[in-house]
């Protein structure tokens, strides 16, 4: 059987947090695209991640990761556009953009994970900023 060792790129459960400033979303997406080529070619059937159980459906899991990242990026992009339309608060400092994006995009996620979500949002904002 063709097993792909993915380390932390693809996990046995959940998804990887690409945390700014060390995590580079461009490099991460490029890695996922390379994994996608390997799984689509049939050279890898299952995944042995650095954490969690073996993943029997390598191709489906990599597709899920890519789709999840695309969805999150679109959610972050939409949140930024919405936030740009909001007026400046009267008499107060405007909160950090990343915090405000987290409140919108990760509203359904327990607040305990918001610090990690914030680092992920910072990586996504950096990525979107480089795209222009």
Give the role of each language-model region.
Residues 79-132:
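C-terminal regulatory/interaction regions
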């Amino acid at each position: 059987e063709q097993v792909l060792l993915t380390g932390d790129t693809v996990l046995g459960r959940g998804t990887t947090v690409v945390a700014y400033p060390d995590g580079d979303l461009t490099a991460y997406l490029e890695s996922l695209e390379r994994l996608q080529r390997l799984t689509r070619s049939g050279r890898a059937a299952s995944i042995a991640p650095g954490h969690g159980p073996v993943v029997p459906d390598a191709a489906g899991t990599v597709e899920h990761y890519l789709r999840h990242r695309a969805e999150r990026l679109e959610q972050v992009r939409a949140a930024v556009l919405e936030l740009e339309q909001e007026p400046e608060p009267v008499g107060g400092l405007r909160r950090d953009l990343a915090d405000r994006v987290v409140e919108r995009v990760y509203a359904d996620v327990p607040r305990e994970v918001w610090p990690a979500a914030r680092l992920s949002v910072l990586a996504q904002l950096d990525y979107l900023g480089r795209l222009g």
